Amino acid sequence: MKNISDYRNKKVLVLGLAKSGVNAARLLHKLGALVTVNDKQQFDDNKDAQELLADGMRVITGRHPVELLDEHFELMVKNPGIPYSNPMVKRAEALHMPIITEPELAYQVSEAQWIGITGTNGKTTTTTLIGLMLNQQRPHHAFDAGNIGIPVSQVAQKVGKDDTIVAELSSFQLCGIKTLHPHIAVLTNIYEAHLDWHGNRANYVAAKMRITMNQTPDDYFIMNWDLPEMHELAKQSKAQIVPFSRKNAEGARAQLIDGWLTFDGDRIMKASEMQIPGLHNIENALAAIAAVKLEGVGDDAIREVLRTFSGVKHRIQYLETIDGRRVYNDSKATNVEAATVALNAFDQPIVWLAGGLDRGLPMDALTPLVKKHVKSMVVFGQTAPLMAKIGKDAGVPVQTTENVMTAVPLAYEVSRPGDVILLSPAAASWDQYPNFEVRGDDFIKAVNQLKATVESGDK
């Protein structure tokens, strides 16, 4: 690590825990900082706070007391989810206290090269592909981190100058960077998202563009050239622009041409050979190809990854082929938009498993997609009546069941070889499950049980 002495005896307030806050606090403590941790959750229910206290850090829980800032902290490391409208953050700004998020801290002490990935959709898949391709070429030297679920401050402690941190960076995280400077930055796309947090679209776009703010003409900024907005945004960057395009946009270096994934006009592989389905994943693959080509990765490594990578867990993740039916887990699809992407990803007839928490949102936009792509539906959860109506309006058979586990055998019964069985709930999981991951894990269990039953000859 570098810049270790910068933190020795420095008074630092870590505001908000969760994974990023805990790891930031531990790193700062290791560097010799005088760490105070403040988290809203009560101490008795706060395992993270209890562990940090046992490690020798000062811990204040139960609320965010603004008067705490009278203690003259020299730095605040803010949990990315806490908005800048929070009274503690506003007071810190009034005191001209530096406020950063955990990736900035990690960058300041890390000796590794950085590749940063942001965007509304596709961040996690693109990050994962880049890491896999780099490690396929040169094993054990690329490390995925950030919004993907592994705090960057955890990774920063174990990497060296010859390594690469491949960091997924959310708009929330990017708002709190100061010096973070990825050699390669990727902006997958920009759509409407998180406007409640950012206040308006302009602020959201500005947050995303912070990924390139410290880049120089020696760096690269990979952008989606199929979106006209990107052409204007590119003018804000000092880096070399490396466009990618699925639609043959002029000037793109990574492109889909006549069904081939290409870079600088050279064919790498047919898009149809990719394990992960969908036009959106072609875009993710092109962004990843652009990034790793700039790092000197060969075509063989790229092909190996794209032919074998079955998807990020719970995101149109290929699970199994059971008696000719391909099964996909898209439990992450917690809204209509995400389910739309999944339904559009397949040319084969779909048996669709859907349902979950009823947020009172309109779902009518799914009806024409069901009519076009779906042969049968199995619905569950609070939104089961809504989903059943969509199926009825589309002229598709619908079965209602209790949950994901009971839906899987029903889906198999109405499917035929050549079909796709797809869990893409179009709803949050909280009516029956603590999160979409648990829902997806239940689906995986049910699919494994079904496979065992079918292969034993009981079905």
Swiss-Prot record:
It catalyses: UDP-N-acetyl-alpha-D-muramoyl-L-alanine + D-glutamate + ATP = UDP-N-acetyl-alpha-D-muramoyl-L-alanyl-D-glutamate + ADP + phosphate + H(+). Keywords: ATP-binding, Cell cycle, Cell division, Cell shape, Cell wall biogenesis/degradation, Cytoplasm, Ligase, Nucleotide-binding, Peptidoglycan synthesis. One of its GO terms (cellular component) is cytoplasm. The gene is murD. Its main location: cytoplasm. NCBIfam families: murD (TIGR01087). Pathway: Cell wall biogenesis; peptidoglycan biosynthesis. Belongs to the MurCDEF family. This is UDP-N-acetylmuramoylalanine--D-glutamate ligase. SUPFAM superfamilies: MurCD N-terminal domain, MurD-like peptide ligases, catalytic domain, MurD-like peptide ligases, peptide-binding domain.
